[in-house]
A protein has these predicted regions:
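C-terminal and inter-domain tail/linker signature
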Residues: 2-162
Length: 162
């Protein structure tokens, strides 16, 4: 099946007009679909800040956020991005919102990943919002257990709002 020159030109124009953030989003989606932890972490800045839906204080730094993502990848079942929104957020950083669906045990999760990028397209801030609350609770408990098992946090630390 061939495409018309107009369609090919439009595709080339949209590809040429893509921003570093657009390219990072495409790489993130591909890495998530492939379950490629290293490729996901390679998209983060060294000083990345990750805001959890269940923890008050953010996770900070590449090593910590990378370890968290290893646990998240084992915890989420049937994770898939189902939408990609663009718009403006306060501040100058380029940003995107990715809508996702997943499961933790028998809990269905609806969520969004809010990403802010640096000028080179690396992810500087990653904020997750999920619903319903029962799914957030199940996710919190499973992730905390995974972080303890991986030695990222001590078992005595509370899994609650810190």
């Amino acid at each position: 099946m061939s495409t018309s020159p107009a369609v090919e030109t439009q595709a080339a124009d949209s590809s040429a007009a893509s921003t570093p953030a657009d390219r990072t989003v495409a790489r993130l989606r591909a890495a998530v679909e492939q379950g490629d932890h290293a490729a996901i972490v390679a998209l983060f800045r060294d000083d990345i800040v990750f805001h959890s839906p269940v923890k008050f204080r953010p996770f900070e730094g590449l090593a910590t956020v990378g370890a968290l993502f290893a646990v998240l990848m084992r915890t989420f079942e049937d994770f898939r991005y189902v939408g990609d929104l663009t718009g403006d957020l306060e501040g100058d950083a380029d940003s995107r919102v990715l809508v996702f669906r997943a499961r933790v045990g028998d809990k269905q999760i609806h969520g969004v990943d809010m990403l802010q990028f640096d000028d080179e397209g690396r992810i500087a801030t990653f904020t997750v919002m999920i619903r319903p609350q029962s799914a957030a609770t199940a996710l919190s408990e499973a992730v905390f257990a995974g972080l303890v098992a991986d030695g990222v946090v001590p078992a005595a630390q509370s899994g609650g709002q810190q």
